[in-house]
Amino acid sequence: MSTRTRLVAALAGAGLMASALAGCGGGPSGGGGEGGTLNVLFAANAQFPTEQQEWFKTTSATFKAQTGSDVTFETFATANDELTKIQTSVVSGQGPDVYGLGTTFTPTAYSTGAFVKLDDAAWSTIGGKEKFVPSSLGISGPDAGNQIGIPFVSRPFVMVYNKDLLKKAGIDKPATSWDELEDQAKKLTTGDQHGIATAYKDNFDPWKLIWGMATQAGNPLIDGKTVKIDDPAVKKAYETYFGWLTKDKVVDPAAVGWSNTQALASFAEGKTGYFLFTSTLASITLDKSPVAGRYAYALMPTIPPGATSRPAGGLDAASILSGDNLVVADYSKKQDLAFQFVKMITDKDAQLEYYKIFGNLPVNAEAASSLTSDPNLKVAAEALDKSVATPFSGGWGDVQLALTNVVVQSIPGLAQGSVSDADLAARLADAQKAGQSAVDRAK
């Protein structure tokens, strides 16, 4: 199949039919001497927007000093924006030279055939695969010989809890199952104090919770070429997630409108037992809040709702294999310059500086090993060890969005206090149809 045909097919799988122009894959090629401007796309950091802009500025200055070339950054705000940018760029054959993509979107990028496949020469240009923490390479491509994603940062997810509130409620250790978490949250909820802080309106958090519960129950959501959204394990996951608000009343009703940043801010006030699906970067906020010195991290529950142990086929998934990968556009005429940029921001000192500012764990092996004295990293490292990659399918981006859309469509019902079985069933059926269609078309 030609690159042009592969692109059209892949983009159809992502929901966009159009003619596409792109070159062939391989190692670094194309212009890349001094001068000119490199274009880089990153996710907008809603939690630390000012710090991100300052990082853009200092990184650009460093790159200018090293190469004589400028860097311009643009950002995307949502998963849908991320997908749209990939689509429009590969169709037109122009756009960013370097993309910073969430790990779960790497399969979608790979399926287009529009990003440089990393041969030995390409890896050597940036310091070799041995430069990176081995587990961070787990979603760089479908296999070790077909990779496009260069690890940038790792973000294994954990939960954070208020030590004082748990002790006061007679809870001696954090929950390890979702049912136990529900029981503890009920004990923690009293007056204006709530058991759980979560973000129903966040663009990323909801689907991760659903994926985690389903994966622990033995449903990977994509099994080969079969999507399994309209499934009892997935339905149970949504019922549990929605039930914290509608049935158990352990979540602040305002959470229907919260982003992850707002949920973190609520936990930081000191009136919530648990904050779910965060990372150690939360410490930057928490250490300046009323809960400073009163919180600790723990693994997310790994036993699915309604169970006391994982069933056959269930995975010990404490987190998605989460973080950001860097990919270089095949259409870029500045690939040599792009790989110089990638090398610069994945070197040890740059990685440690990024960790200091944002709290994201380094994927540079030398940088990561230098942080072992940080007590927060013990839990994060365990979460990384128990991280499971989302399915490497070109249709995953749409499956992820379909899972999110079930929550988006349920927000009005959540705000009113209930989501009916009929409404949930209909939304799961629609999500199943959309996801299966995307996977069927993906290459």
Language-model features: where?
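Hinge/lid segment of periplasmic solute-binding proteins
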Residues: 103-156, 208-209, 214-216, 296, ...
